[in-house]
Amino acid sequence: MIVDYAVMASDDNELYLDFWLPVSKLWKERIGVTPVLLYFGEGNPSEEYGIVVKMKSNKNLPLATCWARYWWAGQQEDKVTIISDIDMLPFSSWYLTEQVARFDNDKYIHINPCIDTYSRLPSCYHIASGYSYKKALQLHDNFQDSLDYLLSQRYDNSTCYIKGVGNDKWCYDEYHATELLLKYKDLIMVNRIGGQSGHRIDRTDWTYDIDKIKSGYYYDSHSIRPYKQNKDAIDKL
């Protein structure tokens, strides 16, 4: 299995969109994977390092941006896509691509399946071909049809929902994908060394060891935000 694309999504919210340029550069130049931004907005994000796919405006933001990543990946047929978050800085090509090279393209991989600590599969780090995404997640050909089906589901997301964030269906993308994938025979869960946030520089504890950066110890960083206010610290990293 060779990863072709890394897909992420955003609307015009600067809290997320501002990460596109630095994150796309990391995916392209450090990891060697083509980054794709599914953009629900009115501007023109840079395509210097990746592909921008303009999506129709949607009343169901931000859930639409979350689910769009699965849906777009499912349209890529024999191409392999890794789903990522736009504020997740990728550092390790071994963790993100090389360790899955041993698997056949008909498998569906998750490289951080922390159900024991997170209660579900995170949207970040699903890896599969378009055929596998479509089959495993029962994706429609039309994005709005696929989103409407997701919205028709009922999940207890009380542990996910945060007042003022998203809506009453926040995290439905993760609950729905998890429900379907746990029944899918070709799912392979590759445990992350150190658990859910192992080998990660996390915004909840923004400290790191420079020698470990140089040695390739860190897989990724869930970045501090917003980017503009923290640009110097993020760019230094």
Where in the sequence are the language-model features?
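Short glycine- and hydrophobic/aromatic-rich loop-to-beta-strand nucleating segment
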Residues: 119-134
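A conserved donor-nucleotide-binding helix/loop in the catalytic core
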Residues: 57-82
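Catalytic core and acceptor-binding pocket of nucleotide-sugar-dependent glycosyltransferases
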Residues: 131-237
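The conserved acidic donor/metal-binding loop of glycosyltransferases
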Residues: 85-89
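Hydrophobic anchor at the start of a short beta-strand
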Residues: 33-35, 81, 187-188
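Conserved donor-nucleotide/metal-binding helix-loop-beta segment in metal-dependent transferases, i.e.
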Residues: 90-122
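N-terminal anchoring/stem segment of glycosyltransferases
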Residues: 1-58
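A structural signal for well-ordered alpha-helical segments within the folded catalytic domains
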Residues: 18-21, 25, 71, 171-179
